[in-house]
Amino acid sequence: MVRMAKTTCSPRADRQQALHAARGRILAAGMAALLTLPALPASAANFTPPDGCRLEVTVQNRGCTVSQHYRCSGDAPGDQWVVYFTPDGPRYQSRIDRETRWMESTDLPSGLVDTLEPGAKDDASFSTLLKTGADDFDFWTSSSNGERLHHVGRDELTGEKVDIDGVELELTRFQLTTYNESGDVLIEREGQQFISRAQGRFYGGVERSSDWTGAVENTNDSPVSFSFPGQPGFGSTKPEYDCDLQMVRGGKPDLMRQLMSFKEART
């Protein structure tokens, strides 16, 4: 929650002032995030990563999204970025490190930015998952709107391997619970994802989520096709799968958008 300094204005004026200030910060954050992305033509034909960065692969996913995965020379070794596009344009951007920790993520339409707080009780560890077959995590993130979120969960390798469009992936099971700062459950998620050892990242899968309102949602964000440099579809920003089903979420309150954005945080 955004806290405003007390003034001599009426309570109504205080609320209006707080609302305008919060909107200003969100818009400013959104513009700053969007300015880090290269300008796209009206047709949104291709994605070009920022200067000093190299696009590695474009992935078409279920659920009407296409993701652009890239690395930047100025980042720490092992860091990588992803930008997700819907038919309406870029929606979500995130950076993970070599252990797939959620370093920072931005919900581009709202401008909300979440960053990993230091000193986690149990950081996510991709190397632990690969070595032992399971990894527990327990960490906090801070949002640009003042919200602090507590994430607790577990990833497990199922032992199954699949080939999707020529890329070898391994299946995982996961469960994740996100709490607010007071310890109230905001959202619970469980399901199946994929990992790529070679690429050092997660990909979405089939999952079930339930939030504090009691709403339940079942989604499928599995990868369908991979386009590498020189291949058709590399850099395309037009989603190709499930768009006729209108599965893309939109118009949700900021908190729900923020919570659901963690679906893509490590992918």
Regions inferred by a protein language model and the residue ranges of each:
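Bacterial N-terminal signal peptides that target proteins for export
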Residues: 5-30
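Bacterial N-terminal signal peptides
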Residues: 28-38
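N-terminal cleavable signal peptides for secretion/export
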Residues: 42-82, 125-131, 135-142, 258-267
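Short, surface-exposed beta-strand/loop "edge" segments at domain boundaries and coil↔beta transitions
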Residues: 63-64, 85-96, 102, 114, ...
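Short, surface-exposed coil-to-beta transition loops
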Residues: 67, 91-93, 149-156, 171, ...
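An acidic-aromatic
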Residues: 74-133
